[in-house]
């Protein structure tokens, strides 16, 4: 990850979902369904990430916001963040595929409902949602577990000192163009933008994940350990 080499640069299997003109809402979960039936993934890290989303769901129910509560429940079922899978490989080699969260996600929306849906997606993925300080009063209404994952931050688009790994945007084309223009002027790695129409709730959770594949030479590790230091 982040290094040059001969392997794929765009990403792993989740990248294929970007090539679809249409996709089912549960596309992320279905991607791994067949393999997981044979060998269940390691999901301890995933389970540690879900309490914040569960707290947001319970809060939505207490506020009479059935739509947000339903979205939280669906995201909890679909998210694959924090899961690890051992891949098939040759003897003497162990390959592990892990999905990790994009740590800092900027939420850009003109309505509170869209902002909360974006936040639910970020919590489902295990990251932190960046909100404008103008939404401080709304943040204060959230349960403590959800509040801990929401950071108030202005100028995240233009301030290069602010860590930013992804952007969720609900709005029209003109507003989206302004966001993309600001991001293009930021130094450092390219930050991806997921754009949706106002009111959309089918946020592609895979856009908030990082795919990591780790290969370990178990033959060398179990034999002459000094071989692991050569390179």
Residue ranges and their predicted role:
Residues 119-125:
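Conserved short alpha-helical elements in the N-terminal third of ANL/AMP-binding
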Residues 1-104, 108, 112-113, 125-128, ...:
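C-terminal segments
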Residues 118-119, 180:
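Short glycine/serine-rich donor-binding loops of glycosyltransferases
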């Amino acid at each position: 990850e982040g290094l040059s080499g001969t392997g794929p640069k765009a990403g792993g299997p989740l990248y294929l979902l970007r090539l679809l003109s249409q996709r089912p809402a549960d596309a992320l979960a279905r991607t791994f369904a067949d393999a997981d039936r044979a060998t269940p993934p390691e999901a301890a890290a995933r389970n540690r990430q879900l309490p914040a989303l569960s707290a947001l769901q319970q809060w939505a129910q207490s506020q009479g916001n059935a739509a947000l509560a339903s979205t939280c429940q669906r995201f909890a079922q679909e998210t694959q963040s924090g899961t690890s899978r051992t891949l098939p490989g040759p003897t003497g080699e162990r390959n592990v595929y892990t999905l990790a969260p994009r740590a800092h996600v900027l939420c850009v929306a003109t309505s509170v409902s869209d902002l909360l849906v974006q936040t639910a997606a970020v919590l489902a993925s295990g990251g932190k949602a960046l909100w404008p300080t103008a939404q401080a009063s709304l943040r204060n209404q959230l349960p403590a577990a959800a509040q801990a994952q929401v950071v108030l931050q202005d100028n995240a688009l233009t301030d290069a000192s602010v860590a930013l790994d992804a952007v969720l945007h609900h709005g029209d084309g003109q507003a989206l163009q302004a966001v993309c223009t600001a991001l293009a002027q930021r130094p450092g790695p390219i930050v991806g933008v997921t754009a949706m129409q106002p009111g959309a709730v089918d946020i592609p959770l895979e856009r908030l994940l990082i795919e990591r594949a780790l290969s370990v030479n178990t033959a060398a590790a179990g034999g002459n350990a000094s071989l692991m230091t050569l390179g």
